A protein has these predicted regions:
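Glycine- and aromatic-enriched mobile tails/lids
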Residues: 1-120
């Protein structure tokens, strides 16, 4: 079997201030609870998208600047997933199931399909 090369960390340093990572994690949690809960509005979703853009930049700095830890990887994946949820919710101009949008209280037949998003 081929040998897997050792992971090169480059100039990454061990996280010296874990509080920054935990604060970002808490901000993500609060953003999703406050702006992307079951009852939504376009205004709240746009606010969430803005906050997630900032978090994405911070997490990118953590990802490339620190030695990777499970917390950094999980935070990166959670921010990516949260961004997809917000983007999808902004595209769907309807209320369906347990997700109610005050701006669009009715179902729309054109959204009676899966929403597929890709981000790289």
């Amino acid at each position: 079997a081929p040998e897997i090369p050792i992971w090169e960390t480059g100039n990454a340093a061990p996280p010296d201030e874990l509080v920054n990572i935990y604060h970002a994690w808490d901000e993500l949690r609060r953003t999703m609870q406050d702006y992307v809960s079951i009852v939504r509005t376009d205004n709240r979703l746009r606010r969430a998208a803005y906050r997630l853009q900032n978090l994405r930049r911070e997490v990118k700095e953590f990802y490339w600047g620190y030695t990777l830890t499970p917390d950094i990887l999980e935070l990166r994946n959670l921010v990516a997933t949260a961004s997809l949820i917000v983007d999808s919710a902004l595209l769907r101009k309807e209320s369906r199931g347990s997700h109610h949008t005050l701006d669009y209280p009715n179902r729309e037949p054109r959204f009676n399909q899966n929403t597929v998003l890709r981000k790289f």
